Amino acid sequence: MKKKENDYAFIDSQNLNLNIRNQGWILDFAHFRIYLKEKYGVSKAFLFIGYVEDNKKLYDFLTRADYICIFKPTLEYKDGSTKGNCDAELVLQTVIELPNYDQAMIVSGDGDFHCLVKYLLEKNKLRAILIPNRDKFSALLK
């Protein structure tokens, strides 16, 4: 009998979404979750995302698609742009969950996760880094 895989994915939603869009694509989050489960045996997928009140329907959809959404309050700037960087939350949650998973997948091309990747490698807990855009990612993740 095959051992049930117990790998978790930690997803930088902003990095994923922006890099997919910059390539002219729109990500189907529901199918991406299925892909993570079927291809990599991901039992839990944590999605780190800035919280915007008007996006409640999106968050409900993501939850129904089997993501565990971790929200960060966003800041709105005078020019109308919003900022909700979730890097610290992703690192912290990955370390909090460490005893609960076999291996982690990090979905991001952001070099801010270099120290996390190094730590997971030292603990033999890194399954893979999924980089949304192979042509545009931090050299720190090579």
Go through the PLM ranges and name each one.
Residues 1-86, 121, 126:
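Domain-level signal for Mg2+-assisted phosphodiester chemistry and nucleotide/NA-binding surfaces
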Residues 4, 87, 135-136, 142:
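Residue-level detector of intrinsically disordered/flexible regions characterized by low predicted structural confidence
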Residues 29-30, 87-92, 114:
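Short, well-ordered alpha-helical scaffold segments within catalytic/effector domains
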Residues 80-109:
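Internal catalytic-core helix/loop-beta-alpha segment
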Residues 101-141:
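Active-site histidine-anchored catalytic micro-motif
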